[in-house]
Amino acid sequence: VDVISSAEQKCADNGVKLTKRRKQVLTALVECNAAVSAYELTELCNQQGYTAMPAMSVYRILDFLEGQSLVHRLSTTNKYIACSHISCQHSHFRRPQFLICNDCTRVQEVDVTSETLSAIERVAADVGFNLSDKQLEVSGTCSDCK
């Protein structure tokens, strides 16, 4: 299934439109297959022959795409990646976890079970800590860089 077609369908299901510029940003993000900053993404879009786009527009588009669950923002690096589940035909109720390689910066999105998240919440609650963001980002070394 084509990722962009799936994204268009998800947007349509939510009553919003994946405009030409939104498509361009999402396509660039999917094709680069890496976590990139909004400024890096702006450069990618502008280098690929798309209509020149200012960084502020890319930020607004990324905000829209994140709201549609088509991209994720990595809090620790302030970079964005395309959701690996865009083309899935089923719902994902689990919270994604991101494995970030310290060497090559590759990011792999994996699901975390509700049991794992509950265990983390319990540990936090035991020390009086309230989780405000349940997105997990773990850094290490990927299998290619070992």
Residue map of PLM features:
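Short alpha-helical segments that sit at the start of domains
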Residues: 1-26
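Basic amphipathic alpha-helical segments that dock to polyanions
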Residues: 29, 58-68
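Short, contiguous, helix-prone interaction/anchoring segments in small proteins
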Residues: 29-31, 43
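Short capping segments at the starts of secondary-structure elements
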Residues: 32-37
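A short acidic, leucine-rich amphipathic alpha-helix
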Residues: 40-46
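Non-DNA-binding regulatory cores of transcription-related proteins
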Residues: 67-146
